[in-house]
């Protein structure tokens, strides 16, 4: 597939040809990365076609978050990132499959069915932005937008062999993103290479008056300033690596060796056990989800239950029929931790611990430029692999720290396991220092020159 950098130099006629080629490929594909053929919606404007995750509002398109409860909901406005794309020569073209309401790590909970990993169709693409990553890796999209709440851009990028960037919280507007967890969610790019990630990130970044959490900063110019010759002081967290598979640990050590040979300084640091981060993340995210999803009741928009006797039954039936099992589970747990008698014991303590984790990151970043970790404990696993929801939650162990602390992080493919499946590693940077993430990843990408196809 043509890269985003190359596509931006195409004429309007050439772009129309490209869109027709993508549409034909999507119709012929069995990956189920797109919800439907992109030509059925058409492009959101003239420009390079960008795949959009199904929780980002595109005016005139049915946006469902891959959930039955939003069937028939047509977005009445563009998300701010869509307006930014249009101003930078890009446009939405197609909606990607995802875990329902972004709650999952496998893209198995979508009401549209599973998405397959293009590297091995018996395996998951990761989630929740699994459709976006599968499409980019499978040659079905030039580039894509995803959202990252606890690793939902970086983990599927790692499983599929793409570059995935989670920006600093507040760097990219969330206006028009259908919320899962408002204090964690961030929109970001999934692309074929680091240059494309930089270009797409620059296009969507910047202050937005319609988002009260948006940082008052101008759009970034990371692509213009990409520098592969910069050298960084990089921290590693040895105690956290023990949970990774042997293949991931080997890829980690080999990448560390490459970073040292490139001239980067590597230092060891310590942090709170990452298993605590899992508990903190899920308590807070489920609490916020139970509040955010209370708006879907069958009254104002989306699916409405039939043959009901009163308002209470309308609420009960609409939500019971509309939400999938994983979403129901998280709503119930969220309501539990917010209930009287448990609020102080769970939610309040989790918020206090979140602040402590953020302070630990800040302390490390007083002495280093970047932190280097795996993205996931394993490469992509088979469908129905997890015996329990808790096992699935543990797959986020390396990614949630950046969300808890609001820091930027980037997933870069660095190796293949014995089955030929991609393995990604992650850099985390100081708040609003996406430039360093992209610089070090750009240099490492060229140094490793990994061939996945």
UniProtKB/Swiss-Prot annotation:
- Catalytic center at which residues? 53 (charge relay system), 128 (charge relay system), 152 (acyl-ester intermediate)
SUPFAM superfamilies found in the cross-reference section:
Amidase signature (AS) enzymes
Q: InterPro entries per the record?
A: Amidase, Amidase_CS, Amidase_dom, AS_sf, GatA
Q: Could you tell me what reaction this enzyme catalyses? A: L-glutamyl-tRNA(Gln) + L-glutamine + ATP + H2O = L-glutaminyl-tRNA(Gln) + L-glutamate + ADP + phosphate + H(+)
Protein biosynthesis keyword on record: yes
Q: Does the keyword Glycosyltransferase apply?
A: no
GO MF annotations in UniProt = ATP binding; glutaminyl-tRNA synthase (glutamine-hydrolyzing) activity
Q: What is its EC number?
A: 6.3.5.7
Entry-linked PROSITE patterns: AMIDASES
Q: Which UniProt keywords apply?
A: ATP-binding, Ligase, Nucleotide-binding, Protein biosynthesis
Query: GO CC annotation: what is one?
Result: glutamyl-tRNA(Gln) amidotransferase complex
Which one Pfam family would you cite for this protein? Answer: Amidase
Gene Ontology BP, a term: translation
> What HAMAP family does UniProt report for this protein, alphabetically?
GatA
Q: How does it assemble?
A: Heterotrimer of A, B and C subunits.
Q: Which family does it belong to?
A: Belongs to the amidase family. GatA subfamily.
What is the recorded function of this protein according to its Swiss-Prot or TrEMBL entry?
Answer: Allows the formation of correctly charged Gln-tRNA(Gln) through the transamidation of misacylated Glu-tRNA(Gln) in organisms which lack glutaminyl-tRNA synthetase. The reaction takes place in the presence of glutamine and ATP through an activated gamma-phospho-Glu-tRNA(Gln).
- What name goes with this protein? Glutamyl-tRNA(Gln) amidotransferase subunit A
What is the originating organism of this protein?
A: Helicobacter pylori (strain P12)
């Amino acid at each position: 597939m043509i890269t985003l950098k190359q596509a931006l130099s195409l004429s309007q006629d050439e772009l129309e040809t490209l869109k027709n080629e993508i549409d034909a490929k999507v119709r012929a594909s069995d990956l189920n990365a797109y919800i439907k053929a992109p030509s059925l919606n058409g492009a959101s404007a003239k420009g390079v076609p960008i795949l959009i995750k199904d929780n980002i509002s595109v005016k005139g398109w049915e946006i469902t978050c891959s959930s039955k409860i939003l069937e028939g909901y047509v977005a009445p406005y563009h998300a701010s990132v869509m307006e930014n794309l249009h101003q930078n020569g890009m446009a939405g073209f197609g909606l990607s499959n995802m875990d329902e309401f972004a709650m999952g790590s496998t893209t198995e909970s979508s009401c549209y069915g599973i998405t397959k990993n293009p590297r091995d169709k018996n395996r998951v693409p990761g989630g929740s932005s699994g459709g976006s990553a599968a499409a980019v890796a499978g040659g079905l999209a030039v580039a894509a937008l995803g959202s990252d709440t606890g690793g939902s851009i970086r983990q599927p990028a790692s499983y599929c062999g793409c570059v995935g960037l989670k920006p600093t919280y507040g760097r990219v507007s969330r206006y028009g993103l259908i919320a899962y967890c408002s204090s964690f969610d961030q929109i970001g790019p999934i692309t074929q290479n680091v240059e494309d990630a930089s270009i797409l990130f620059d296009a969507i970044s910047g202050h937005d008056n319609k988002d009260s959490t948006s940082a008052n900063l101008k759009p970034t110019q990371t692509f213009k300033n990409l520098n592969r010759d910069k050298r960084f002081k990089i921290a590693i967290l040895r105690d956290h690596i023990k949970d990774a598979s042997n293949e991931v640990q080997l890829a980690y050590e080999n990448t560390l060796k490459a970073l040292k040979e490139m001239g980067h300084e590597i230092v060891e640091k310590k942090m709170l056990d990452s298993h605590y981060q899992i508990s903190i993340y899920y308590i807070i995210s489920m609490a916020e989800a139970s509040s955010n999803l209370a708006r879907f009741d069958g009254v104002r928009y989306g699916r409405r239950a039939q043959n009901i006797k009163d308002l209470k039954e309308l609420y009960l039936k609409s939500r019971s029929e509309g939400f999938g099992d994983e979403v129901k589970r998280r709503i119930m747990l969220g309501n539990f931790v917010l209930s009287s008698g448990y609020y102080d014991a769970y939610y309040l303590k989790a918020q206090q611990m979140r602040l402590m984790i953020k302070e630990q990151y800040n302390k490390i970043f007083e002495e280093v430029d970047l932190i280097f970790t795996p993205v996931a404990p394993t490469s992509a696993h088979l469908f129905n692999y997890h015996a329990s929801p808790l096992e699935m939650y543990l797959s986020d162990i390396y990614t949630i720290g950046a969300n808890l602390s609001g820091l930027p992080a980037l997933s870069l493919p660095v190796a293949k396991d014995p089955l030929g499946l991609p393995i990604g590693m992650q850099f985390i940077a100081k708040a609003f220092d996406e430039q360093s993430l992209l610089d070090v990843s750009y240099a490492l990408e060229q140094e490793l020159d990994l061939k996945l196809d």
